[in-house]
Each structure stands twice: as C-alpha cells, then as structure tokens.
C-alpha cells in the first residue's frame, strides 16, 4: 500500500474488464458509468502485484464468485500472474451506505439547494475514500496500488453491485 505511484512505468494496468455474468443486464447510463470508470483507471494508475518477479503492464479481470471479489491479474501477453479472492463482507456496509448517499445525491440534484447538494456530495466522497482505504488495506501484501488507483478500483467494485 502506498500513497505515491510506483516509479516503474510497468507497474500499471493496461486493461480492465468486468465479468458480464457478475454485472448482469443494466441500463445504457450504468454501462456508460462503468466504461468511464474503467477508462479513468486505465488512464492513470499505479498497480503491481506484490512479489511479482516479472514486469507489467498488467491486465485485470474483476468478477464476483460465491460472495467473493475475484481479481484475476495477468500480463498483457495473457500469462497468469496471480488471482486474489477477497471476502465482500468487509465492504458490505460501506458499499450499502455509498449507494444510499449516491441515491440521495442524484435526487438532490433535481430539487435541493447548492449547499445541500455540496453537503451530500462531501458525504459521498467521504464514503468513497473510506471504501478506497479499506480496499488498500485488504490488498496490502497482495497488490501495491496508490490511493487514486484504489479509488478508481473501488468505483468498479461498486459497479459490480450496481445492477441497474
């Protein structure tokens, strides 16, 4: 876990995919949000499996399997590097709270004052930060990633729960 990106240009993700079976059918708006989150992560990230003797860049396939988050990490060539299975239990509360605040935020945009919208958005960002920190902690010793990359990855974990 680090606050600054790894200095190696190879310590990064070049592709990220979400398992279709894990996300199910969704609206065009939700599909667009997921695609944007993936693009943001690929554009700017620091990501390296701990103890990997090889070089990146890496590809990441994210799925849900038996109530576990599966991070399947490979090299661009397709060579398997590692697959991590993380329990979703530690994420349940923060993801649930995050969705509740997001729903409040989207409802507030239609009718609330700018100060109310800002207050809700601050809460949303705080929960997003909490989820990102939790993700970094759960990946400690498994994957080295900076906070901004953890934020973008947390967005995608939420996307797996956001089935439209």
Swiss-Prot record:
**Top-level lineage group:** Bacteria
Cross-referenced InterPro entries, in alphabetical order? UCP032146
Q: Which Pfam families match?
A: UPF0262
Name the protein family. Answer: Belongs to the UPF0262 family.
Q: What name does this protein carry?
A: UPF0262 protein Xaut_1232
């Amino acid at each position: 876990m680090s606050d600054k990106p790894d200095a190696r240009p190879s310590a990064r993700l070049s592709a990220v995919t979400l398992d279709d079976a894990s996300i199910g059918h969704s609206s065009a708006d939700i599909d667009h949000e997921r695609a944007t989150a993936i693009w943001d992560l690929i554009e700017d990230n620091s990501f390296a499996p701990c103890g990997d003797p090889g070089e990146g860049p890496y590809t990441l396939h994210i799925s849900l399997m038996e109530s576990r988050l599966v991070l399947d990490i490979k090299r661009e060539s397709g060579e398997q590097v590692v697959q991590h299975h993380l329990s979703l239990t530690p994420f349940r509360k923060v993801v649930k709270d995050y969705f509740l605040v997001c729903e409040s935020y989207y409802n507030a945009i239609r009718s609330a004052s700018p100060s109310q919208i800002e207050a809700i958005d601050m809460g949303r960002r705080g929960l997003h930060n909490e989820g990102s920190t939790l993700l970094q902690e759960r990946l400690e010793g498994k994957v080295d990633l900076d906070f901004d990359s953890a934020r973008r990855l947390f967005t995608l974990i939420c996307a797996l729960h956001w089935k439209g």
